Amino acid sequence: VSGRKKIIEFKNVTFKYTRCQEPTLKNVSFDIYEGEKVLIAGSSGSGKSTISYCLNGLIPHMYEGEMSGEILIDGERPCEMKLHELSGKISTILQDQDAQFIGLTVKEDVAFVMENRNIPLKDMNLSVAEALEKVDMEAFQNSNPHEISGGQKQRVSLAGVLASKSGILLFDEPLANLDPASGENAMKLLSEIHKKYNKTVVIIEHRIEEVLSEKFDRVLVVSKGEIIANGTPQEILLSGVLVSAGLREPHYIRLMKLVGCNLNEYHNLDSPSVVKEASAQEKIHNFLARRVIKRESDEEREYALEVQNLTFSYGERLIFHDLNFSIKKGEIVTLLGANGVGKSTLSSVITGFLRHSRGEIKILGEDISNASIKKRGELIGYVMQNPNLMITKNSVFDEVAYGLKNKKVAKQEIVERVHQLLKICGLYGYRNWPISALSFGQKKRVTIASILVLNPMVLILDEPTAGQDYKHYLEFMGFISKISKMGIGILFITHDMHLALEYGDKSIVLYDTSIIAESTPTRVLMNCDIVKKASLREHSLSNISKLLNISSLELTERYLAEEGRQYE
C-alpha cells in the first residue's frame, strides 16, 4: 500500500444502536487504501454488517444510535454527506436484495442509478445491456425482480453496481443467495472488475474458503465488535484466528492440520495447491492408509415422506416431471441444484402452497395430496429462505412462542420449550431483544426456532445455513441431528456442499425437470459431471485429489471419518 491514498479510514469508532445496552462496535480502527481488495470476516452478530452500515450511510441515516470516533470516505465524513452524494463514492449490494430493488423490471432497476445521474438514454441502454450480460441476466431484463430466484436477484443487484461509476464497491455477504457455481463466478467477476478498473473492493463475508478462492490484499477479522486480526490471507490462515472467531477454516487447511502438517513451513496457504509440496503429499498419502469405520445405516426405518410421480407446471412451463424420492424417519436428505431449477417450488408443492397436477405425496404412508395447508402444517414444518417474510412479532421470545400460543399450550411449558430452543440455537441471550436489532443470520435462527418448537414430523428447511457463521452452524446442525434421531425426516434445500457432506445421509440433485442423482453425498459431490450440471462447485477435497492424483471418494470418506461427523 506504499504510496497509495487512504480511501476508507476508521479511527477509534464505537457505535451503540439506540435499542441496545452494549455497543456493537468497540474502538474499531483500520485503513483501506485506494485500489485494495479487502475481506471483512466475522461470525453472525460480530459487528461486520454494522461496519458496512457505517460505510454506506445507513448509519446514521437509517439506523440511529450513539457513535464516537471518526470515519472518513475519500477524506469526507459520511455522516455529514447526503446519501446521494455518498453513493457517488461507494456503491453497496445489500444481503437482502428485496429491500434494495426499485424498478418494476430488471432493466429498470439496473438503470435506476443512471437515471438519477441524467445519463443519456442511448448510453444508459448500452450500459444496462453490458451489465446484465456480465452477470448472465440478459434474458430476464423484462422480468419483475421480486419474482426471480434468490441467486438471480443477487446478480441483478450486482449488475446495478457494475452500471455505477463509484470508486468503492461494498458487498454485504454477496454469496448468501447464490448457488455454488454462480458464487464462484461472482468472485471471479469481482476480481476482474477490481483488476480492470482499479476499484476499491470491500467484501463482508463469513464463507472463508469460497471467498478466498480469489486473491485478496488483506483480511480483517471481526469478533464481538472488535478487529482481532488484520493481515494478508497467508497471515490470517496461519494464525488460527478464524476458529477463535467462530469461522470455518478452508477444508484443505483442516486436512493439512489433520495429517500433521506444520503450517509454518508453507508459504502459499491461500491456495489449495499448497498440498502439492512434498512434505504435505507424503503426510496425506500416509493418512489415506488409515482404516475407515463406516456408519451403519438402518434400512428398515419407515418412510417419513414419499414423493411419487410428482409433476408440476407454472402455466405451460414444466418445472418438474415424474419426480420420485423418499425420506426415511430420522434421515437427513439434501436437495441440490442450480438457482431457478425448482427446489423451492418443490417445497411449496409438498407443503400445499402450490398444487401439483399429477402424483402423490405421502407422510408416514398417508397420501396428503388433497389435504389442506392447515392439515399439512401439523405434519410438515417449513422454514423459508428469507426470514423477514416469516417474522410477525417484535421480540425474539414472542416470535418463537407464537405457534405454541396458538395451540393453547400452557404458559409455563411455552417458557420452558422456547428457552430450551433459544439456548440450542444460540439465541437465549437475545430472548428479550427486538428482532429489528438482530443481524440477518440471527433472524434466520429465530424463524428456524419458531418452527422447531412445534415438533413437526417432517422438517423442510430452505437454505437453513444462509447467513449462519460456522459456530452457529455447528450448534444448529448439532440440534438438527438430535431432531433426526427422534425420527423426524429432514429435507434441506441448500447450496451448502459442506452441510451435505458433513451431515447428509443422502443427496438428491434436481436438473432440467428431473432428478439426475440420488446417492450418498460423497458419491454425488465427488462426481464432476453432476457437479457441473447442477451448478454446484468442485469441492476443495476433489480439487486436492486431482492435484495429487488420488481418489476423491477415498480422500473425502477418510477425511469425514477422521474429522467426525458431528451427529455421531
Where do the language-model regions lie?
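The feature captures the beta-strand-to-loop junction immediately N-terminal to the Walker
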Residues: 41-43, 336-338
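Helix-to-loop junction immediately C-terminal to a conserved catalytic motif
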Residues: 56, 351
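Conserved ABC ATPase "signature" region
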Residues: 122-140, 412-430
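Catalytic Walker B motif of ABC-type/P-loop ATPase nucleotide-binding domains
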Residues: 169-172, 459-462
